[in-house]
């Protein structure tokens, strides 16, 4: 009785287990009997697969189950001249492969199981050709013949066309690769050491390793195809049996997903690795709806030979995410296409709607050898978000998008095209650290670009978009095209140089606005747009052999926008747009075209040099220029007074309808030993206190200040006389005089014909003429009353304003018309009684 009950319990357990864990095959391989495939095993671990159906140089096998146990093997004992082995699994159970798959010769192996495929930690390959693991329903050939895993009893394969395609089902199974994970020894400034690289799923050089299924996950999985291709394609459900054509490319294959309307998800976690590096580096292509590379995983193509490398492409129709935006960060997560020899590197391309770079993750396009790198191109139709990582709010790790050259080769260009671009604790860098020129950076965002340097409560870190030279090569340029550009709290856009190579240019085209804003009190950071030649820090001087004082020239900054706003904070560093040279070279030019420019709280537009010629500043403003609260526009040369500084200061040219300088704001063009350069302001209205505009030199010749009224015509102006006229013939006798009084006249117009006349509005510019023939009004009395006439000033309402000597706004009154006549009486004659 007890045995009967135990047997019932056991039977129930088996039934329940089969319901709870469906479609997981046991570790075995068996033929389904539809083809002449034979499977033999002496120990239940190692399986010998023979026979099958041969058509020309293609071999077909059919299995009801196909799973390889741990430390076991599946050996396809094919003839050496077989080109392709097609293996289907028809039993409806997932293939669980945790051992070795072998084949003879150079045959390509296709493993087809619509139910799904799982590779374990011990899975490995020993085949001479390419390997395809797919959850497609069938392989369809060009002549219409189909090798189906869902309808295995179709007509026999008598003749086939060599060009196959994968017929995907409406709900393809998933593919998972579990593995030990691999953390390579590499960084932003160093190539990856692959000498102790582990292996899992690996094909011979030049071949293709492809996973084509529903959702595809690599959890520590290692995929390697030296000089070949890694193709991962996640095909989603509801595709109406879409076809994926396969095209031979060299010894590998290319997949065409143009007929697939719905894609699945691809995820790399737990230090997963995709690697096509080697003496001939290959290509990597990931395609899905969402693609995630995180948890210290790496996608790597590193060219170590003389042939050119292939491209790295991540195409996610919805989202591509590199790194993880959580407390753990992803500082060892990389997507990299590198070259360390004479062969050129490939391109790194990301195509998606939304691209995210999180947690200190890195996109690299570096060259360490003579070979030129490719280009980095990010196309995200909706948004690009790059956010760094601060594990303890003390230290920070920026998310990095880098193109670096350490050799004679030019660094690769970086281009981002999107609708909205947002950066926080993240860097976009194109640098040269060798003899080659730096790469160019182009940011295209239809709507807006927002760059935030520091985050409140987090110490350290910043955000920069930087093209720089730390060697002999010239730095690259930065170009920004958007509607609105916003930089805040230590964010920077710059082209820099620290050695012999010149700094590049910075060009900003923002149709609506450019805003630079500092809100955090932090004396180490400044929000800025700059072209700078700086002095290298000691560690850079040691690493790259740099001189303590550079000889490079600064580049030019050009900004075109409707509204430019630069604002610091009363307790913070000052936001600024600057061209600066701390070495022996010259400063670059700074050109801004805008409708309005507003500077506040110590904001500055500046050009300065240590020794060379100062750069010019040109502001072409349609409406108004306003400087408030100690803001400045300066052009300086020879900032180090102890050095032999002979550079002249740069010119400042301002064209604006209105110019306002308030609350201690200044416009200066100064030099040390060189000459102070000129300041030219053309405006209809200029408001500011005395001495707010200077052009000087410490030891050289001061510059000139020219303030022109845009409405004053230059035609007809003549030179004024320098000598006084004969006053006896210019003023009629009879003028009243008092003690210590004097009256001088110079010029050619602007006074009445005789002292009895009155100056009215229409007569202000009357000519001076000889009055020797005019009669005398009457003699002046010998005595007079020296007491001034007391007239009580009327009290009237204020109806106008002026800027007083302190620079403050003061309300004043204009008198009525009857009183105005007395105010306008410009005569020194005595009235007749």
For the regions a protein language model found, what residue spans apply to each?
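Extracellular and secretory-pathway beta-repeat/beta-biased strand scaffolds
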Residues: 2-833
């Amino acid at each position: 009785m007890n045995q009967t009950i135990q047997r019932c319990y056991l039977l129930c357990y088996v039934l329940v287990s089969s319901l709870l864990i469906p479609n997981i095959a046991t570790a075995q391989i068996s033929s389904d009997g539809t083809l002449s495939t034979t499977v033999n095993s002496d120990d239940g671990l190692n399986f010998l697969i023979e026979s099958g159906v041969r058509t020309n140089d293609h071999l077909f096998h059919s299995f009801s189950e196909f799973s390889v146990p741990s430390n076991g093997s599946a050996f396809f004992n094919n003839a050496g001249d077989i080109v392709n082995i097609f293996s289907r699994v028809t039993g409806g159970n997932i293939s669980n492969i945790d051992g070795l798959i072998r084949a003879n010769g150079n045959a390509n192996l296709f493993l087809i199981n619509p139910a799904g495929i799982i590779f374990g930690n011990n899975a490995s390959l020993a085949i001479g050709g390419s390997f395809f693991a797919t959850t497609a329903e069938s392989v369809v050939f060009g002549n219409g013949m189909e090798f189906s895993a869902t309808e295995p009893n179709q007509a026999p394969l008598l003749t086939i066309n060599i060009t196959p395609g994968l017929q995907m089902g409406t709900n393809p199974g998933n593919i998972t690769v579990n593995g030990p994970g691999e953390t390579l020894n590499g960084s932003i400034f160093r190539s990856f050491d692959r000498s102790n690289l582990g292996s899992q799923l690996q094909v011979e050089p030049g071949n293709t390793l492809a996973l084509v299924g529903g959702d595809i996950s690599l959890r520590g999985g290692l995929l390697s195809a030296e000089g070949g291709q890694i193709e991962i394609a996640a095909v989603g459900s509801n595709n109406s049996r879409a076809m994926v054509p396969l095209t031979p490319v060299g010894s590998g294959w290319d997949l065409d997903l143009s007929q697939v309307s719905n894609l699945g998800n691809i995820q790399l976690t737990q230090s997963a690795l995709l690697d096509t590096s080697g003496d001939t580096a290959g290509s990597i292509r990931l395609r899905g709806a969402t693609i995630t590379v995180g948890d210290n995983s790496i996608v790597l193509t590193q060219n170590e030979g003389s042939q050119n490398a292939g491209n790295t492409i991540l195409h996610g129709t919805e989202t591509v995410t590199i790194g993880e935006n959580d407390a753990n960060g992803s500082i060892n997560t990389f997507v990299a296409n590198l070259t360390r020899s004479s062969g050129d590197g490939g391109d790194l391309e990301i195509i998606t709607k939304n691209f995210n770079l999180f947690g200190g993750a890195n996109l690299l396009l570096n060259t360490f050898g003579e070979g030129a790198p490719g280009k980095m191109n990010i196309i995200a139709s909706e948004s690009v978000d790059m956010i760094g990582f601060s594990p303890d709010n003390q230290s920070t790790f920026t998310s990095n998008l880098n193109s670096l050259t350490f050799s004679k080769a030019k660094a690769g260009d970086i281009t981002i095209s999107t609708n909205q671009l947002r950066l926080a604790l993240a860097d976009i860098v194109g640098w040269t650290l060798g003899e080659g020129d730096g790469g160019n950076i182009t940011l295209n965002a239809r709507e807006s670009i927002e760059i935030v340097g520091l985050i409140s409560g987090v110490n350290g870190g910043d955000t920069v978009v930087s093209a720089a030279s730390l060697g002999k090569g010239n730095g690259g340029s930065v170009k920004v095209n958007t509607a609105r550009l916003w930089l805040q709290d230590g964010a920077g856009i710059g082209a820099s140089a620290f050695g012999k190579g010149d700094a590049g240019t910075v060009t900003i085209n923002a149709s609506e606005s450019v805003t630079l804003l500092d809100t955090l009190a932090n004396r180490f950071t400044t929000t800025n747009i700059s072209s700078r030649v700086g002095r290298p820090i000691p560690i850079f001087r040691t690493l790259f052999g740099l001189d303590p004082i550079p000889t490079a020239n600064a580049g030019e900054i050009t900004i075109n926008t409707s509204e430019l706003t630069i604002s610091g904070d009363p307790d913070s560093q000052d936001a600024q747009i600057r061209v600066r040279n701390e070495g022996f070279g010259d400063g670059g030019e700074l050109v801004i075209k805008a409708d309005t420019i507003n500077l506040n709280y110590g904001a500055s537009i500046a050009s300065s040099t240590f020794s060379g010629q100062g750069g010019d500043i040109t502001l072409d403003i349609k409406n108004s220029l306003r400087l408030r609260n100690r803001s400045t526009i300066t052009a300086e040369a020879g900032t180090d007074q102890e050095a032999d500084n002979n550079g002249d200061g740069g010119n400042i040219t301002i064209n604006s309808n209105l110019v306002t300088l308030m609350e201690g704001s200044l416009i200066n063009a100064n030099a040390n030993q060189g000459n102070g350069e000129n300041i030219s302001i053309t405006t209809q209205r200029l408001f500011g206190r005395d001495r707010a505009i200077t052009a000087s030199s410490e030891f050289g010749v001061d510059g000139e200040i020219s303030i022109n009224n845009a409405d004053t015509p230059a035609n007809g102006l003549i030179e004024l006389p320098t000598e006084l006229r004969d006053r006896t013939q210019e003023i009629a006798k009879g003028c009243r005089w008092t003690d210590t009084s004097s009256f001088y006249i110079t010029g050619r117009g602007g006074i009445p014909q005789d002292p009895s006349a009155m100056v009215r509005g229409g007569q202000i510019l009357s000519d001076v003429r000889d009055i020797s023939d005019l009669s005398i009004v009457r003699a002046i009395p010998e005595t007079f009353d020296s007491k001034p006439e007391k007239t009580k000033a009327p009290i009237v309402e204020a109806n106008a304003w002026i800027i007083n000597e302190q620079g403050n706004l003061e309300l004043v009154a204009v008198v009525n018309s009857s009183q105005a006549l007395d105010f306008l009486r410009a005569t020194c004659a005595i009235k007749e009684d």
